[in-house]
Amino acid sequence: MFWTRYAGASILLFLMLIHLGQVYPRNDITNFGCEECKLKENNIFSKPGAPVYQCMGCCFSRAYPTPLRSKKTMLVPKNITSEATCCVAKEVKRVLVNDVKLVNHTDCHCSTCYYHKS
């Protein structure tokens, strides 16, 4: 009787895992909850007939061990080196909305994160 409970629970867990695998078949877990880098309308500054767009979304980032020869040249040696790209505007157009000068993004791409540089 004790073993049948374990077998029943194991089978139930196995069936739930199979169901989850079918519900979320080919989702990339690394981007889960974050859309690709693209233009989206800014609801705060947009008005009917004059939409304002901005770049939003995710790009890649990664971390890896710092190569020894690079570590030797660092003022403050770090064990981990990281790279990241951010969703930035490739092209922009300046617009005036309610006497406020704005930059309307017209094209987006993944590029260097400027706020990470020091």
Curated annotation (Swiss-Prot):
Disulfide bonds join 34-58, 37-87, 55-108, 59-110, 86-113. The keyword Oxidoreductase does not apply. GO terms for molecular function: follicle-stimulating hormone activity. Keywords: Disulfide bond, Glycoprotein, Hormone, Secreted, Signal. Residues 1-23 form the signal peptide. GO terms for biological process: G protein-coupled receptor signaling pathway; positive regulation of steroid biosynthetic process; regulation of signaling receptor activity; thyroid hormone generation. Glycans are attached at residues 79, 104. GO terms for cellular component: extracellular space; follicle-stimulating hormone complex. Its main location: secreted. It is found in: Secreted. Shared alpha chain of heterodimeric glycoprotein hormones. These hormones bind specific receptors on target cells that in turn activate downstream signaling pathways. Involved in gametogenesis and steroidogenesis. Belongs to the glycoprotein hormones subunit alpha family. Heterodimer. Glycoprotein hormones are heterodimers composed of a common alpha chain described here and a unique beta chain which confers their biological specificity to the different hormones. This is Glycoprotein hormones alpha chain. It comes from Hypophthalmichthys molitrix (Silver carp). The lineage of its organism: Eukaryota, Metazoa, Chordata, Craniata, Vertebrata. The gene is cga.
